[in-house]
Structures are given as C-alpha cells and as structure tokens.
C-alpha cells in the first residue's frame, strides 16, 4: 500500500472491501454470555421460590399420606410458571438494555476515502483507513499518526495515564510509542490524522477483553429504596407466619384430644397443615414482584424514551429526571436548530483572497458533497465559501500550515500560522471582544464595528471576528513555530481586524412551548451559553425563560449592572461563594460562560437543595455533566461528553429534555400504582388467611390459589401498570423531593383503607358461609370465595390505573393495550382454573348466574372508585 498516497486520498471502495475481508469488522467480541439454562436455574435461587419448593415437598409427603397428588402438582406447576414468566421478562429487559451496545457501535467517525472526508459508523472502520480526530472524539481503532497538531490523548482506559502528549515521532517513555493512537482512548486537545493498523479484537483494548459498553446493572436509588421496603415487608410477613404457626399448633395441641393418642401420622399431618398455612402467609406477604416491576418499568421506559430521542445510558437517569427542579441548558443545537448560516460577512481590512484563506484554514470542519461534517459554526463558514464558488480544499492545498492553535472555550479563539505565496501570516478567528483586543483599530472603526456587532447580537445571531498579521521573515528564521511561539505572536496585540461575521441559528419552533411546560411543572430553566450578553438576552426572550424582562444591556453587549436574572461568566467568577449561593436561584441566563462557570452554578444549585439536569456537548462540559444529578449529552456532541453523561439527546432538542422529565415522572407514578395494588392485596390476603384460621375453617385460600393470585398481582399487574403510557398531566404538578419515600401518606392511607375494607367484606362472606353450612364451608363456597377475592383485585386494578388522578379509569382505556391484555388474561385464567382446576386448585365449576353475580357485585369496587374520582373532579372545578 502506498502510504503517502493513502494519506492523501484514503482507501477506495474496493480496498475497503478487501481490508474488511482480510482483517474483519471493527467490533469487539462481547464477553461470553451466561447460558440461558444457567440464567433460568438462577431463578430457583430466589428465597421465595425455595420456600415454595419446600412447601411442594411437604405437600408431596401429605399427598402420599392422603393419596391425593393434585395440589402438589399444582404447586410444582405454579413454581415452574412463576420462574419461567420471571425469566422471560428479565431476558426481555436485558435485550432492551443491550441496545446501548448496538448504538455505541453506530458512533460516527470521520474518515478520508476516495479523496473525500466522510462520516461512517465506527463498526465500518477498516485497517488502512485514514481517520480524522479532534477534541472530544473517542479513538475508534488502533493506528499510527500521520498528522499531529498539539494532540493530547487520555489513555487512562488502557495505561492509567490521564494525558499523553503525541507526536509523529515514535519512542518516548510511555507504555506505547508516541506516534501510536489506540481504540477507546479520548482526544483531550488538538487534532490529528492516523492510518488504522488494527480493528476489533486485534486492537489493544480488544486483546485485554475489556468491556467497552456502558454498565447497566447498577441499582438505582429507587431500586434500593424499594428493595428495603420489600425486605421490611418480608420480615413482617415471616414473623407473622412463624408466630401463627406456633400459636395455632399450640392451640391445637391444647384443644385436640388426638394429641393424647398414638396416631403419629395424624399428628404429623396436623403439623404439616399448619406449616403449609405458614408458607402460604409468607408467600402472600413477600412482594417478590417488586424487583421485576422496577426492572420491567425501567426497560420499557428506556425503549420508549429511545423512540422519543432519549438514549438512557445510566438507569438512575430514568427516575431522577422525574425529580429534576432545575435544567441548565446550552443554546446551540438544544434551543436552536443547529442549522447555522452566515447572514453577514463584512470585510474590514486586507484583500478578499486572504480572508478566504483565513476561513478555509481556521477550521476543522469538512464538506462531503455539500453536507457539513464537524463544528456547525465552522461548517457554516465553509458553506458560505462554497456559495461564493470557492473550493476550501483547494485553498488549503495552496498554503503550507506551519502551526495551528486549536479553539478552546478558555481562549475563545483559534489561530493558524501559514505560508501563503512565500509570505508567512498569522490568521485568527474567534469571539469579537477577544480578537478585537488583540488588534490595532482606529476609534471610528472600533465604534462602527461595535454598533454592527451589537445590532446582530440583539437579533440573536452568533458573531465572529477575523484578524491577521504578516510575520517578518527575520522572526520566522529564529522561530521553531511551537505553541508558545504562536501565543507570543498573539500576545503582541498588533493584529489587523480582517472581517466580522454574523451567523444565524433559528430557535427550534417547539422550544418555547417546551420551556413553558417545564416552568408550569415547577422546573426552572437556565440558559448557560458562551455567546455574548446581548445574544443570550435575545435567546432568553424568545424562549421565555425570564420572569420579567431584564434591562441595562450595554451597547458593547456587556452587562452594565448586576441584573438579578442575567450574569456573565466573568461576573459569576468574581462572586464569593456566599454571593454566588444567593444569586444562583435568580439567574436565568449566563452569557460568555466557561465550563468552570457551569460547574460552579450546578454546585451552588445543588447546595440549595435543587435536583439539577445539565446539557453539554463538548469535552470541557464533562465536569459539569459528572457533577449534575443528570448529565444530558447531545447526540452531535463529543464522545468525552457522552461518556460523562447519564442520558443522550439524540436529536439535541430541548423538547426531548421536557419529554424525559415527563417520562421520569410517569415512571414514578406507575411504580406507585403497582405498589398500591400489590400492597392492598398483601394486606387483605394476610388478614384473610389469619382470619380464616381464627374461626376454625380450612385455609380459605390454598397454596395453589395464593400462587395464582401472586402471579396476577406480581407479574401481570407489574406488566399492566408498568406499560401505561406517560401522561402530560404529570407536568402540571410540582417536582417531588428526591428524598421522598415512594409510598406517601395518601397512598399509605389508601393501602390500609382498601386492604382492611376488602378483608372485612371477604371475612364477612367467609363467616356467612361458615354459619350457613352445617358441616363448615364446602368446596363450592370456597370456590365462590376464591373467585370473589380475585375479582375484587381485578376491579381494583382499574383504581390503581387511575391512582392520584381525578380522571375516570376508562380514560384512554383502548390505548392501554398492555392493560387490556392483562385484564383479559386474568378473567380467562380465572375461568379456566375454576372450571378445570378441580382438586389441584380446590375448585368446582360455577354456573353462569354465579359468575355474573360475582362479577356484578365485586364491580362495586370500581364504581366506588369512580364516584370518589368524580367527587374530587367536582371539588377541583369549584376551586
């Protein structure tokens, strides 16, 4: 392969095909997955399943004594169903989480092929490709540098070295030669080009088999909170069941004369019967559906949020977004369309040809068949050149670049030292107030330029200034064109103002409404931008972040007073910590902000007890993204920002942030609904089993019946309620506190009230059946009792759906397909169990009249809920 030619034009399509066949795709082989059988068998390690298995074997002993194996078979079938259904849903959730890995391989990479710069997915990179990298990029493959401009790489993923200086020369005292660049490392400064030497598993990161995808198994704060709740309920249930076992056994020993005889089989049967009662209590008390409800909710939310352009990288972001009280957002791309166009470009001094060269050189962007690749501002300038009929690539080829000082948020400018027709020039591009300070300008031109810039900035345009100077030959003979030399040339402050430009980037049409939606939801929106005060003010006005319109913006675009709602980065830095703490709440727009200013604002807001979400697209945004409760990177942003974030906005839009808040709040609400439904069942069933034993009847609910109820309550209720779509109504509420317990007072009261009422109704039915029958409660009556209990929960599922809402439970009912499927499954499943369950479920078929009677009478649960919600609607309207 001709290396020099390859550097200039890259690979051809045929060479790409040959390289891929020879060296393979640029994909790391994922770690060996645990086999499906092992994952399935792991379900049997669940304590509740193990308790059920013990119960099944105890039941088997009883079956041999009584010569009746149907209930035992029922328990084993129920255990199999519970583990299989749980296994299926967890596998389905895992598949949804694996989307992260697949999407990370779609990360765009800039390469030179067929003489053109283009973007391709990371997995399409092949050995021999010429790859272009700049600040914030993740290196997609191993290679050798062919161009190196102040390139600094973070190699901590491989060597532990946070920053390594790179050069075109090999050697050095590092773990790898200085001209070698490696996959999964990050570009922290400068830019470079390299020829790929290894892809996929052949890379250094592939050899050490280090997992390169985002971890998703970390427990979220809510998960941990609910885990504690589940353990607490389990302990209470276990204590009650053990106490019940001993109380009833002792009571039987004291009152049953059989214990004085020698019928040991009968005694063992009594002990086993009470043991089964204790197991039934434990099974009913332990809310083993909680972990699955959370996993299922998070997985469903993650999949759906992806469809609304939110890629969740860390699970806690799903729930934390629901508690956000402040959003600190960038301007470019998030609030604007990121479709930058040069509105005005005015030449001030020098000839037009030099300005064209300055624009072409002071840029890391590229055009591929007119499609911009790279920084939007620089892309707009290249498109402007293209519209003038000038080829930026030809302009670059005509000159010899000696040194380039890349743009940084600290410097707010970029500089290139280059030879043009035998002369040496320093070309500078950057923020007008920075560049103009380094120029020699007449007062009249300074005033005129300041007025023009102010006019453009008040139209929310981004402004740039270009400057240059010709370098004396005597200076160049003694210069080594190092970074320090270029900085020294800039610090001489003797540049000539070359041109000024205004670049328009319209506000996204959906942003003002999204900002207002957030404000109505009790969320403050703060714009943190690198633009001038006047530009930032206009943006703030257009999207509606201000309480009242701020004043006192000077003609030069700077703030002439410390208006409470606006501040510059420089003024923010000058405040003491106490002053900054007080100001943080009132700030709506921070202009000319640096990354350290954004991080300090986040820190101050957090000290005030706010839950903060932050957007960022650049490498220097990483600290603020790390610091925030939720870091939101932009899909068009750098890999460094993406790695530091918790969620990625694939379309970069602020509307997606508002959607993420709605999703987070809806997720929390759905989990509250599930908890209400689950715990009402637990309270009612626990009291029923105890109550039935107190009046001396057989256990009103058998182990197999309890397992069916648990399957409904845990698995399918979790599916139904977790799959409820998000509602914009949650955006009318104030944010919850992050420290709030998920079961608030009203939900706790509802659980106890409904649980006790359901128990009293069912217990009254049990007592009625006990007293009506001469020989106790028969199987037919117990079947009606069991079906009544299930149907009460069936109707209560509607109430759970409408929990904490004034609306009818039938609102958007036909859209809730998951809910409809679960309701149909429960109804059909109950009919099958009652009709064909027989001895296995201790049931006998019911007549149509009995079914209609049970369904009609238990529906009172729903209609009572509907009346209560109608009453609340009426009260709300009167207010």
Where are these regions (language model features)?
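Conserved cytosolic headpiece of P-type ATPases
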Residues: 1-735, 740-743, 756, 771, ...
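Transmembrane alpha-helix entry/boundary detector in multi-pass membrane proteins
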Residues: 778-782
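Generic alpha-helical transmembrane segments
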Residues: 713, 758-759, 783-798
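Alpha-helical transmembrane segments of multi-pass integral membrane proteins
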Residues: 749-765, 791
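Long hydrophobic segments that form regular secondary structure
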Residues: 767-768, 772-773, 777
């Amino acid at each position: 392969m001709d290396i020099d030619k390859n550097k200039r034009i890259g690979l051809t399509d045929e060479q790409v095909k040959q390289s891929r066949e020879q060296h393979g795709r640029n994909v790391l082989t994922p770690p060996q997955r645990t086999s499906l059988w092992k994952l399935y068998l792991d379900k049997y390690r669940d304590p509740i399943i193990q308790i059920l298995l013990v119960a099944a074997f105890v039941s088997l002993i009883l079956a041999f004594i009584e010569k009746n194996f149907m209930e035992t078979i029922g328990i084993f079938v129920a255990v199999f169903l519970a583990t299989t259904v749980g296994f299926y849903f967890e596998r389905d959730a895992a598949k949804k989480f694996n989307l992260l890995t697949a999407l990370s391989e779609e990360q765009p990479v800039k390469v030179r092929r067929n003489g053109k710069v283009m973007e391709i997915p990371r997995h399409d990179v092949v050995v021999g490709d010429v790859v272009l990298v700049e600040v914030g990029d993740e290196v997609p493959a191993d290679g050798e540098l062919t161009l190196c401009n102040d390139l600094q790489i973070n190699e901590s993923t491989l060597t532990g070295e946070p920053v390594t200086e790179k050069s075109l020369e090999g050697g050095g005292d590092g773990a790898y030669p200085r001209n070698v660049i490696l996959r999964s490392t990050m570009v922290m400064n400068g830019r470079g080009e390299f020829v790929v030497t290894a892809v996929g598993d052949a890379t250094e990161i592939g050899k050490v088999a280090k997992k390169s995808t985002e971890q998703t198994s970390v427990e979220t704060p809510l998960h941990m909170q609910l885990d504690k709740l589940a353990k607490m309920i389990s302990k209470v249930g276990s204590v009650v069941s053990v106490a019940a076992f001993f109380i009833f056994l002792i009571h039987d020993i004291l009152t049953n004369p059989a214990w004085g005889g020698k019928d040991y089989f009968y005694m063992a049967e009594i002990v086993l019967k009470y043991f089964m009662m204790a197991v039934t209590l434990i099974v009913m008390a332990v809310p083993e559906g909680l972990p699955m409800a959370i996993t299922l909710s998070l997985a469903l939310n993650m999949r759906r949020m992806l469809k609304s352009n939110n890629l969740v990288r860390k699970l806690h972001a799903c729930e934390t977004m629901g508690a956000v009280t402040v959003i600190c957002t960038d301007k470019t791309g998030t609030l604007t369309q990121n479709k930058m166009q040069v509105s005005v470009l005015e030449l001030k001094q020098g000839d037009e040809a030099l300005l064209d060269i300055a624009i072409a050189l002071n840029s890391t962007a590229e055009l591929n068949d007119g499609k911009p690749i790279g920084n939007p501002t620089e892309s707009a300038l290249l498109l402007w050149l293209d519209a003038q009929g000038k080829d930026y690539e030809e302009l670059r080829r005509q000159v010899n670049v000696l040194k380039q000082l890349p743009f940084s948020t600290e410097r707010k400018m970029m500089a290139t030292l280059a030879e043009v027709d035998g002369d040496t020039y320093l070309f500078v591009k950057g923020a007008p107030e920075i560049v103009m300070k380094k120029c020699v300008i007449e007062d009249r031109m300074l005033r005129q330029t300041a007025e023009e810039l102010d006019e453009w900035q008040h139209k929310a345009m981004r402004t740039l200034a270009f400057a240059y100077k010709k370098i004396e030959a005597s200076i160049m003979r003694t210069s080594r064109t190092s970074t320090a030399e270029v900085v020294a040339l800039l610090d001489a402050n003797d540049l000539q103002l070359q041109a000024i430009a205004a670049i328009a980037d319209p506000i996204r049409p959906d942003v003002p409404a999204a900002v207002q939606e957030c404000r109505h939801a009790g969320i403050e929106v703060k714009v943190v931008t690198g633009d001038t005060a006047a530009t930032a003010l206009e943006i703030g006005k257009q999207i509606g972040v201000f309480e009242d319109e701020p004043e006192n913006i000077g003609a030069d675009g700077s703030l002439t007073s410390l208006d409470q709602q606006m501040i510059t980065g420089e003024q923010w830095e000058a405040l003491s910590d106490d002053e900054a703490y007080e100001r943080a709440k009132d700030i709506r727009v921070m202009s000319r902000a640096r990354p350290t200013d954004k991080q300090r604002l986040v820190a101050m807001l957090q000290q005030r007890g706010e839950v903060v979400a932050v957007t960022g697209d650049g490498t220097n945004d990483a600290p603020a993204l790390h610091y925030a409760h939720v870091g939101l990177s932009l899909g068009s942003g750098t890999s460094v920002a993406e790695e530091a974030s918790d969620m990625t906005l694939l379309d970069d839009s602020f509307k997606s942030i508002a959607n993420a808040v709605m999703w987070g709040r809806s997720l929390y609400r759905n989990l509250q609904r599930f908890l209400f439904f689950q715990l009402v069942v637990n309270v009612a069933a626990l009291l029923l089993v105890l109550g039935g034993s107190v009046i001396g009847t057989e256990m009103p609910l058998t182990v197999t019946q309890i397992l069916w109820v648990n399957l409904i309550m845990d698995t399918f209720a979790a599916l139904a309620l977790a799959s409820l779509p998000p509602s914009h109504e949650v955006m009318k509420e104030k944010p919850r506190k992050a420290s709030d317990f998920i079961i608030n007072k009203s939900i706790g009261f509802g659980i106890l009230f409904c649980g006790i009422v359901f128990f009293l109704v069912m217990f009254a039915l049990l007592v009625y059946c006990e007293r009506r029958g001469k020989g106790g409660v028969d199987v037919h009556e117990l079947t009606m009792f069991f079906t009544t209990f299930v149907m009460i929960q069936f109707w209560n599922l509607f109430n759970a759906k409408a929990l904490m809402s004034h609306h009818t439970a039938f609102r958007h009912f036909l859209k809730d397909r998951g809910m409809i499927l679960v309701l149909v499954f429960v109804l059909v499943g109950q009919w099958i169990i009652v009709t064909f369950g027989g001895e296995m479920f201790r049931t006998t078929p019911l007549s149509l009249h009995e079914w209609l009677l049970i369904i009609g009478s238990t529906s009172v649960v729903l209609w009572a809920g509907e009346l209560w919600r109608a009453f609340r609607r009426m009260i709300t309207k009167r207010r």
